[in-house]
Amino acid sequence: WSLNKAIKSGELSPLDFAKKARSFDIDAIEYVSGLYTNHTDTLKKISMQKLSKELLKRSDDYGIDNVLIMIDSQGSLASSNKKERLKAIDNHKKWIDLSAEIGCKTMRVNLNGEKDLNKWTKNSVKSLTALNKYNENINVVVENHGGLSSSGKYLSNVMSKVKLENCGTLPDFGNFCMNGSPWGNCTQMYDRYLGTEELMPYAHAVSAKSYDFDDQGNETSIDYKRMMDIVKKSGYQGYVGIEYEGNRLGEDDGIIATKKLLQKFI
């Protein structure tokens, strides 16, 4: 997602993601489904099968590990409308297939579609159970990504009820806005450090969100040392994804700055 502006503008083809990552001396990547669907017309030109072959070929060409794919705009997995929820599950299955084909062990989903906590929890457990049983070799994980899912307490409770090893979380350092806009008008913010601590026991991936940096290279709104101490204390051994979402620095510079900061604490 750090390169979403370049891809949306047409400056960078989403098929060249692996090549671009290698230019930063990065050897593992996370894909975003929307950058092949609703933000570009990639999947209007080629099929899912051709897309998977192309992504695998290009990642192999540049020595890149395909780690994860983030899925958006494929329906509401927490919806109380059964027909809508089952359709969302079905929509996500083709992306589980693509994940397996390109070697991604993990696929991130969102839990949207319901504001009532009890209904949201019940619906989320049903959908996650179905998706994780569809292919037990693929980890289907949930990111704190707005609404009820941005509560570490609520999301970790869902995980405890699913009870499948390949079901888990993707803690994002920045996405803890439960109400309002996370871009300046958030009316209910969950404590990001508590939330990360609550989600890490179930983590199959981690997103290091960043927005801006001071003269010493520190993130101006997130204490990276504190965050990485939480990550390491949990025993997590996987990749930490770079997710720069700022405006002052360009995307390339933001990626480089986030990488340098992470390297101080890993």
Where are these regions (language model features)?
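A short helix->loop->beta-strand "cap" motif at the edges of active sites that frequently abuts
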Residues: 64, 138, 234-238
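A cross-domain feature marking catalytic cores of carbohydrate-active enzymes
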Residues: 31-35, 68-73, 109-113, 142-146, ...
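Active-site clefts of carbohydrate-active enzymes
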Residues: 203-216, 237-251
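Residues at the N-termini of beta-strands
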Residues: 28, 66, 106, 205, ...
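Active-site groove signature of glycoside hydrolases
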Residues: 98-119, 136-145, 241-242
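Conserved, mostly hydrophobic/aromatic
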Residues: 21, 59, 88, 99, ...
